[in-house]
UniProtKB/Swiss-Prot annotation:
Organism: Arabidopsis thaliana (Mouse-ear cress)
CDD domains, per database record: F-box_AtFBW1-like (cd22157)
Name of the protein this chain belongs to: Putative F-box protein At1g58090
Disulfide bonds: none
InterPro entries: F-box-assoc_dom_typ1, F-box-assoc_interact_dom, F-box-like_dom_sf, F-box_dom, SCF_F-box_component
Record-linked SUPFAM superfamilies: F-box domain
Domain F-box: 1-46
Pfam families linked: F-box, FBA_1
Length: 371
């Protein structure tokens, strides 16, 4: 009996829901599938269905932690991504965009690399950038084709004026372009508060005004704007800490197209989590953002979240209910932990492979490769 072959459109409907890590192994199954997995429309559909994972970067290893929330006893799986260049060059994570990691090292002359851990042989090497500290990767989403770039920035103050030096690396030209812009000190001044996330090619982070006004914001770096107009306030946060030092705030992505923000009181350890009601579209100005309370976690034994560099989280809401997944460090013993909260369940899992300081970030694995 000859087996019947499914129509290609039905195969595609099934395959785009398969995790990309599995699809990579299927590339050699047949020529049609290999071609399909390179199709941009298919890649974007698959990315939109992706499940978040947690990336941990130590001085010698990069790990990816997947979380299985499908049953009553959630579990994790730890993978060593085996980035061979990490141990000898001192690379640190500077950003994640479309499942691709941007890492930079100041050792041995300096320089960066962009790579997708699903295609570890394909790496994009970035030349050293002069005189810039903070760097971020993103793309101009206003164009039909994504135009990826890296933006670095450093500032120097003198007699009430600030000179911002911007370094922009265009992937299309494979070169850095440096420009200087002078501005007066702004009052109130927007102060960066916590780590950064990427959405629609732009970079977002929490911030507050100095002098402090009691309000907190999401600030953004818009990769589609002229460089001197790219940094701006996006929207107001629902956070309530009277002083910036009494609470910890961490930003995350929810359902792939919305924001989630966590705020923890350092006194009571209570955690409140909000999510945006509607998706954040490309080109949105933030004026119509509506926040809704997602979850409150009141556990006296919960850790105090101090370092956003090594703390990351994501939330989910499916047929099993609302879930909160947190990765954070402990000092004694020095270790990495994953907390999973769902209803009355609070599960704490130690990551045995990590016994040192680390960076942590949430990302979605993808088939996207940055040229």
């Amino acid at each position: 009996m000859v087996s019947k072959k499914l129509p290609l459109d039905l195969e595609e409907e099934i395959l785009f829901r398969v995790p990309p890590r599995s699809l990579v192994r299927f590339r050699s199954v047949c020529r049609e599938w290999n071609t399909l997995f390179k199709n941009k429309r298919f890649i974007n559909k698959n990315f939109a269905c992706g499940r978040p994972e947690i990336m941990l970067n130590t001085h010698s290893h990069i790990y990816s932690i997947s979380v299985d929330l499908k049953d009553e006893n959630p579990t994790i799986k730890v993978r060593d991504l085996r980035f061979d260049h990490l141990s000898c060059r001192g690379y640190h994570l500077y950003g994640i965009c479309d499942g691709n990691f941007f890492m930079y090292s100041f050792l041995n002359g300096g320089g960066g690399v962009v790579w997708n851990p699903l295609f570890w042989r394909q790496t994009k090497w970035i030349a050293k950038a002069e005189n810039t500290c903070g760097k971020a990767i993103g793309y101009d989403g206003s164009r039909p084709e994504k135009s990826y770039k890296i933006i670095g920035r450093s500032s120097c103050s003198w007699q009430g004026k600030v000179t911002d030096t911007y370094s922009v690396f265009e992937f299309a030209t494979n070169a850095w372009k440096v420009t200087d812009h002078t501005r007066f000190h702004e009052k109130p001044e927007l102060m960066d508060d916590s780590g950064r996330v990427s959405l629609n090619g732009n970079l977002y982070w929490t911030a507050y005004n100095s002098p402090h006004t009691g309000q907190y914001f999401i600030a953004m770096l818009d990769f589609s704007k002229e460089i001197e107009k790219s940094r701006k306030t996006f929207c107001v946060l629902p956070c309530k800490g009277e002083k910036s030092t009494t609470h910890t705030r961490i930003l995350s992505i929810y359902k792939g197209d919305r924001f989630s923000v966590l705020e923890q009181s350092k006194k009571t350890r209570e955690i409140e989590i909000w999510v945006t009601k509607d998706q954040i579209g490309n080109g949105d100005d933030g004026d119509d953002v509506v926040w809704i309370k997602f979850m409150t976690v009141s556990r006296p034994d919960f850790p105090i979240l101090l370092s956003y560099i090594s703390t990351s989280y994501f939330v989910d809401n499916d047929i099993h209910g609302k879930s909160f997944v947190l990765c954070c460090p402990s000092k004694r013993p020095k270790a990495a932990w994953v907390y999973i909260v769902r209803g009355d369940l609070c599960k704490k899992i130690k990551i045995d492979q990590v016994l040192c300081e680390f960076q942590s970030s949430v990302y979605v694995p993808s088939l996207i490769t940055i040229p």
